[in-house]
């Protein structure tokens, strides 16, 4: 499958005429990525992650929390994301959707303050799970 002809031409025009906006957005994503990485290193040093090299998301390794979910029919990354959504109101993607059940995918497309609030809630859930376990 491929984008429609109209979408392809719109993409060409965007690439020709949106250089300043592209640079501005790239800088904003870099700032958010750096803020997320700094937060994770400071607030969740016991949880590793795959540092992004150009995407607008990162993968957080939750494999150490696997036993917190016991027997289940769904992948534990899905169980974690559902718990995070239901209890902390933060939406992330389960790594199982990308063939990486030991991870969750965190997008940093939201503004920096929203991103850091969400990461704080992830930190809180991780700490709660470790206390319960």
Go through each PLM region and give its residues.
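PLP-dependent class I/II
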Residues: 1-133
């Amino acid at each position: 499958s491929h984008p429609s002809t109209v979408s392809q031409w719109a993409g060409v025009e965007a690439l020709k005429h949106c250089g300043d906006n592209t640079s501005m957005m790239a800088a904003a994503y870099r700032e958010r990525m750096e803020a997320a990485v700094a937060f994770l290193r400071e607030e969740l040093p016991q949880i590793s992650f795959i540092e992004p090299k150009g995407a607008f998301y990162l993968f957080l390794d939750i494999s150490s929390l696997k036993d917190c979910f016991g027997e289940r029919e769904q992948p534990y990354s899905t169980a974690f994301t559902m718990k995070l959504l239901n209890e902390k109101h933060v939406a992330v993607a389960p790594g199982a959707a990308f063939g990486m059940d030991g991870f969750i995918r965190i997008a940093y497309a939201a503004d920096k303050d929203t991103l850091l609030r969400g990461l704080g809630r992830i930190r809180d859930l991780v700490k709660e799970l470790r206390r319960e376990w």
